[in-house]
Amino acid sequence: MRIGIALYSFSGFAESALRGIAAYARPNRPWTFDHGNQTLSGVNRLLSRNPDGILISVSDPEVCERLQAAHVPIVNMHYADALPRAGRVSNDDAAIGVLAAKHFLSRGHKRFAYYAETGEPIDGRLRGFREELARSRHSCEVFHGGPYNDLAEYEARYEQPLQRWLQGLPKPIGVFCAHDHFAWRVAESCQGADISVPAEVSIVGVDNDTAICALADPPLSSVQTGSLRIGYEAAKLLDQMMTGEPLSGANILVPPVRVITRRSSDAMAAADTLVATALTHMRTHLHDTKGICLLYTSPSPRD
Protein backbone atom coordinates (compact mmCIF):
# COMPACT_ATOMS: atom_id res chain seq x y z
CA MET A 1 0.00 0.00 0.00
CA ARG A 2 1.14 3.53 -0.78
CA ILE A 3 0.83 6.09 2.05
CA GLY A 4 1.24 9.83 1.62
CA ILE A 5 2.70 11.76 4.59
CA ALA A 6 2.69 15.55 4.96
CA LEU A 7 4.09 17.00 8.20
CA TYR A 8 6.19 20.01 9.11
CA SER A 9 9.67 18.66 8.46
CA PHE A 10 11.59 20.80 10.93
CA SER A 11 9.70 20.35 14.18
CA GLY A 12 10.02 18.19 17.24
CA PHE A 13 6.41 17.09 16.82
CA ALA A 14 6.99 15.86 13.26
CA GLU A 15 10.13 13.94 14.18
CA SER A 16 8.39 12.07 17.00
CA ALA A 17 5.18 11.52 15.02
CA LEU A 18 7.15 10.02 12.14
CA ARG A 19 8.87 7.63 14.53
CA GLY A 20 5.45 6.61 15.82
CA ILE A 21 4.21 5.98 12.28
CA ALA A 22 7.28 3.86 11.55
CA ALA A 23 6.82 1.90 14.78
CA TYR A 24 3.33 0.88 13.67
CA ALA A 25 4.10 0.25 10.00
CA ARG A 26 7.48 -1.41 9.87
CA PRO A 27 7.06 -4.73 11.71
CA ASN A 28 4.77 -6.43 9.16
CA ARG A 29 2.96 -3.95 6.93
CA PRO A 30 4.09 -3.56 3.30
CA TRP A 31 3.59 0.20 3.21
CA THR A 32 5.48 2.48 0.84
CA PHE A 33 5.70 6.11 1.94
CA ASP A 34 5.66 9.32 -0.11
CA HIS A 35 6.66 12.38 1.91
CA GLY A 36 5.46 15.85 0.92
CA ASN A 37 4.38 19.10 2.52
CA GLN A 38 1.03 20.62 3.49
CA THR A 39 0.86 23.19 0.69
CA LEU A 40 -1.69 22.81 -2.10
CA SER A 41 1.04 21.89 -4.57
CA GLY A 42 2.52 19.40 -2.11
CA VAL A 43 -0.84 17.72 -1.52
CA ASN A 44 -1.55 17.62 -5.26
CA ARG A 45 1.78 15.88 -5.74
CA LEU A 46 0.88 13.28 -3.10
CA LEU A 47 -2.53 12.70 -4.67
CA SER A 48 -0.96 12.29 -8.11
CA ARG A 49 0.79 9.18 -6.77
CA ASN A 50 -2.61 7.53 -6.14
CA PRO A 51 -2.14 6.87 -2.41
CA ASP A 52 -4.22 4.32 -0.54
CA GLY A 53 -4.25 6.66 2.45
CA ILE A 54 -2.83 9.96 3.72
CA LEU A 55 -1.36 10.96 7.08
CA ILE A 56 -1.22 14.74 7.40
CA SER A 57 -1.23 17.72 9.77
CA VAL A 58 -3.19 20.50 8.08
CA SER A 59 -5.69 23.30 8.69
CA ASP A 60 -5.43 25.45 5.52
CA PRO A 61 -9.00 25.73 4.10
CA GLU A 62 -7.93 25.43 0.44
CA VAL A 63 -5.81 22.36 1.09
CA CYS A 64 -8.55 20.78 3.22
CA GLU A 65 -11.10 21.33 0.45
CA ARG A 66 -8.82 19.56 -2.01
CA LEU A 67 -8.33 16.64 0.37
CA GLN A 68 -12.05 16.30 1.08
CA ALA A 69 -12.69 15.99 -2.66
CA ALA A 70 -10.09 13.24 -3.09
CA HIS A 71 -12.13 10.40 -1.55
CA VAL A 72 -9.02 8.85 0.01
CA PRO A 73 -8.83 7.65 3.64
CA ILE A 74 -7.17 10.48 5.60
CA VAL A 75 -6.06 10.93 9.20
CA ASN A 76 -5.31 14.49 10.30
CA MET A 77 -2.90 15.08 13.19
CA HIS A 78 -3.59 18.81 13.43
CA TYR A 79 -5.18 20.35 16.53
CA ALA A 80 -7.75 22.17 14.37
CA ASP A 81 -10.70 19.98 13.35
CA ALA A 82 -10.37 21.10 9.74
CA LEU A 83 -11.23 17.81 7.98
CA PRO A 84 -14.57 16.69 9.48
CA ARG A 85 -14.86 13.56 7.32
CA ALA A 86 -11.30 12.44 8.06
CA GLY A 87 -10.07 10.58 11.09
CA ARG A 88 -8.26 12.73 13.63
CA VAL A 89 -5.57 11.97 16.19
CA SER A 90 -4.19 14.99 18.02
CA ASN A 91 -2.96 16.41 21.31
CA ASP A 92 -5.30 16.77 24.24
CA ASP A 93 -4.67 20.50 24.36
CA ALA A 94 -6.69 21.13 27.52
CA ALA A 95 -4.58 18.53 29.35
CA ILE A 96 -1.43 20.30 28.11
CA GLY A 97 -2.68 23.56 29.64
CA VAL A 98 -3.50 21.83 32.92
CA LEU A 99 -0.01 20.32 33.11
CA ALA A 100 1.64 23.72 32.53
CA ALA A 101 -0.52 25.35 35.22
CA LYS A 102 0.33 22.64 37.75
CA HIS A 103 4.03 23.10 36.98
CA PHE A 104 3.90 26.82 37.77
CA LEU A 105 1.68 26.34 40.84
CA SER A 106 4.08 23.75 42.25
CA ARG A 107 6.79 26.40 42.15
CA GLY A 108 4.79 28.92 44.15
CA HIS A 109 3.61 31.16 41.32
CA LYS A 110 0.58 33.40 41.91
CA ARG A 111 0.70 35.38 38.65
CA PHE A 112 0.32 33.84 35.21
CA ALA A 113 0.27 34.72 31.51
CA TYR A 114 -0.27 32.99 28.17
CA TYR A 115 1.32 33.77 24.80
CA ALA A 116 0.15 32.38 21.45
CA GLU A 117 -0.13 33.21 17.78
CA THR A 118 -2.53 35.89 16.57
CA GLY A 119 -5.74 34.06 15.68
CA GLU A 120 -4.31 30.91 17.29
CA PRO A 121 -6.84 28.07 17.16
CA ILE A 122 -5.25 26.24 20.09
CA ASP A 123 -7.83 27.58 22.53
CA GLY A 124 -7.80 24.23 24.33
CA ARG A 125 -4.37 24.93 25.82
CA LEU A 126 -5.50 28.30 27.14
CA ARG A 127 -8.78 26.82 28.37
CA GLY A 128 -7.04 24.03 30.30
CA PHE A 129 -4.50 26.50 31.70
CA ARG A 130 -7.22 28.90 32.87
CA GLU A 131 -9.44 26.20 34.35
CA GLU A 132 -6.62 24.70 36.40
CA LEU A 133 -5.59 28.16 37.65
CA ALA A 134 -9.22 28.97 38.51
CA ARG A 135 -9.30 25.98 40.86
CA SER A 136 -6.72 27.88 42.93
CA ARG A 137 -8.54 31.20 42.36
CA HIS A 138 -5.97 32.56 39.93
CA SER A 139 -6.37 34.11 36.47
CA CYS A 140 -3.97 34.87 33.62
CA GLU A 141 -2.99 37.64 31.23
CA VAL A 142 -3.10 36.82 27.49
CA PHE A 143 -0.98 38.12 24.61
CA HIS A 144 -1.53 37.15 20.98
CA GLY A 145 1.39 38.26 18.90
CA GLY A 146 2.70 37.20 15.55
CA PRO A 147 2.46 34.21 13.23
CA TYR A 148 4.02 30.86 14.03
CA ASN A 149 6.20 30.66 10.93
CA ASP A 150 6.73 34.23 9.65
CA LEU A 151 9.72 35.73 11.46
CA ALA A 152 9.75 38.89 9.32
CA GLU A 153 6.15 39.77 10.23
CA TYR A 154 6.81 39.01 13.89
CA GLU A 155 9.83 41.32 14.00
CA ALA A 156 8.03 44.10 12.13
CA ARG A 157 4.74 44.07 14.03
CA TYR A 158 4.98 42.14 17.28
CA GLU A 159 8.52 42.10 18.67
CA GLN A 160 8.33 45.47 20.44
CA PRO A 161 4.73 45.01 21.70
CA LEU A 162 5.73 41.64 23.17
CA GLN A 163 8.66 43.22 24.99
CA ARG A 164 6.46 46.04 26.35
CA TRP A 165 3.86 43.50 27.47
CA LEU A 166 6.50 41.50 29.34
CA GLN A 167 7.88 44.64 30.97
CA GLY A 168 4.41 45.60 32.18
CA LEU A 169 3.52 42.24 33.72
CA PRO A 170 3.54 41.94 37.53
CA LYS A 171 6.45 39.80 38.69
CA PRO A 172 7.39 37.11 39.44
CA ILE A 173 5.15 35.49 36.84
CA GLY A 174 4.82 32.20 34.98
CA VAL A 175 4.39 32.57 31.21
CA PHE A 176 2.94 29.59 29.34
CA CYS A 177 3.60 29.62 25.58
CA ALA A 178 1.55 27.66 23.03
CA HIS A 179 4.71 26.40 21.25
CA ASP A 180 8.44 26.26 21.94
CA HIS A 181 8.98 28.83 19.15
CA PHE A 182 6.95 31.34 21.17
CA ALA A 183 8.75 30.42 24.39
CA TRP A 184 12.05 31.20 22.62
CA ARG A 185 10.66 34.59 21.58
CA VAL A 186 9.69 35.33 25.17
CA ALA A 187 13.17 34.37 26.40
CA GLU A 188 14.77 36.65 23.78
CA SER A 189 12.44 39.52 24.66
CA CYS A 190 13.21 39.15 28.36
CA GLN A 191 16.91 39.25 27.59
CA GLY A 192 16.44 42.44 25.53
CA ALA A 193 14.44 44.08 28.32
CA ASP A 194 16.85 43.02 31.09
CA ILE A 195 14.19 40.80 32.69
CA SER A 196 15.63 37.89 34.68
CA VAL A 197 14.58 34.38 33.63
CA PRO A 198 13.42 32.49 35.66
CA ALA A 199 13.61 34.74 38.74
CA GLU A 200 11.18 37.34 37.32
CA VAL A 201 9.63 35.55 34.35
CA SER A 202 9.38 31.76 34.34
CA ILE A 203 8.77 30.22 30.88
CA VAL A 204 7.24 26.93 29.71
CA GLY A 205 6.66 26.01 26.04
CA VAL A 206 5.05 23.04 24.32
CA ASP A 207 6.44 20.19 22.16
CA ASN A 208 9.84 19.68 23.81
CA ASP A 209 11.59 20.55 20.57
CA THR A 210 15.03 19.72 21.92
CA ALA A 211 16.97 21.88 19.45
CA ILE A 212 14.94 25.01 20.20
CA CYS A 213 14.92 24.33 23.94
CA ALA A 214 18.70 23.91 23.98
CA LEU A 215 19.46 26.97 21.83
CA ALA A 216 17.38 29.36 23.94
CA ASP A 217 19.06 31.28 26.75
CA PRO A 218 18.27 30.00 29.30
CA PRO A 219 17.29 26.53 28.02
CA LEU A 220 13.52 26.15 27.87
CA SER A 221 11.23 24.02 29.96
CA SER A 222 8.56 22.44 27.79
CA VAL A 223 5.52 20.17 27.90
CA GLN A 224 6.46 16.87 26.26
CA THR A 225 3.44 15.97 24.16
CA GLY A 226 2.41 12.46 23.19
CA SER A 227 3.55 13.01 19.59
CA LEU A 228 5.17 9.56 19.33
CA ARG A 229 1.87 7.97 20.31
CA ILE A 230 -0.04 10.35 18.01
CA GLY A 231 1.96 9.05 15.04
CA TYR A 232 1.39 5.44 16.08
CA GLU A 233 -2.34 5.88 16.68
CA ALA A 234 -2.76 7.85 13.44
CA ALA A 235 -1.14 5.05 11.43
CA LYS A 236 -3.28 2.46 13.23
CA LEU A 237 -6.47 4.43 12.54
CA LEU A 238 -5.54 4.87 8.88
CA ASP A 239 -4.87 1.15 8.58
CA GLN A 240 -8.34 0.41 9.94
CA MET A 241 -9.93 2.93 7.58
CA MET A 242 -8.12 1.48 4.55
CA THR A 243 -9.43 -1.98 5.37
CA GLY A 244 -12.99 -0.70 5.27
CA GLU A 245 -13.84 0.00 8.89
CA PRO A 246 -16.33 2.93 9.15
CA LEU A 247 -14.11 5.23 11.19
CA SER A 248 -14.33 8.52 9.25
CA GLY A 249 -14.82 11.30 11.79
CA ALA A 250 -13.11 9.36 14.59
CA ASN A 251 -11.41 11.72 17.04
CA ILE A 252 -8.63 10.46 19.35
CA LEU A 253 -7.05 12.82 21.88
CA VAL A 254 -3.61 11.90 23.21
CA PRO A 255 -2.59 13.29 26.64
CA PRO A 256 0.80 14.94 27.24
CA VAL A 257 3.60 13.00 28.90
CA ARG A 258 5.14 15.48 31.36
CA VAL A 259 6.87 18.84 31.72
CA ILE A 260 10.58 18.60 30.93
CA THR A 261 12.08 21.08 33.39
CA ARG A 262 15.04 23.15 32.25
CA ARG A 263 16.44 26.44 33.53
CA SER A 264 13.68 28.71 32.15
CA SER A 265 11.28 27.57 34.89
CA ASP A 266 13.53 25.85 37.40
CA ALA A 267 13.02 28.33 40.24
CA MET A 268 10.68 28.97 43.13
CA ALA A 269 8.61 32.14 42.79
CA ALA A 270 9.11 34.89 45.37
CA ALA A 271 8.75 38.67 45.27
CA ASP A 272 12.32 39.06 46.53
CA THR A 273 14.91 37.63 44.11
CA LEU A 274 17.26 36.69 46.98
CA VAL A 275 14.45 34.74 48.64
CA ALA A 276 13.63 33.10 45.30
CA THR A 277 17.24 31.99 44.92
CA ALA A 278 17.26 30.57 48.45
CA LEU A 279 13.98 28.70 47.92
CA THR A 280 15.22 27.23 44.64
CA HIS A 281 18.46 26.10 46.28
CA MET A 282 16.58 24.47 49.15
CA ARG A 283 14.21 22.65 46.78
CA THR A 284 17.14 21.41 44.69
CA HIS A 285 19.06 20.23 47.78
CA LEU A 286 16.06 19.05 49.79
CA HIS A 287 17.88 15.92 51.03
CA ASP A 288 21.31 17.55 51.25
CA THR A 289 21.68 18.92 54.80
CA LYS A 290 25.16 20.22 54.04
CA GLY A 291 23.79 22.34 51.20
CA ILE A 292 21.14 23.88 53.47
CA CYS A 293 23.71 24.65 56.18
CA LEU A 294 26.02 26.34 53.70
CA LEU A 295 23.13 28.46 52.44
CA TYR A 296 22.21 29.46 56.01
CA THR A 297 25.73 30.57 56.88
CA SER A 298 26.49 32.34 53.59
CA PRO A 299 26.59 36.14 53.84
CA SER A 300 23.91 38.08 52.00
CA PRO A 301 25.09 39.87 48.85
CA ARG A 302 23.39 42.95 50.32
CA ASP A 303 25.73 43.03 53.36
Positions of the model-derived regions?
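Short, structured active-site "lid" loops
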Residues: I56
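Conserved small/polar residues in nucleotide/adenosyl-binding loops
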Residues: Y296-D303
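Bacterial carbohydrate/catabolite-sensing allosteric modules
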Residues: M1-G53, V63-C293
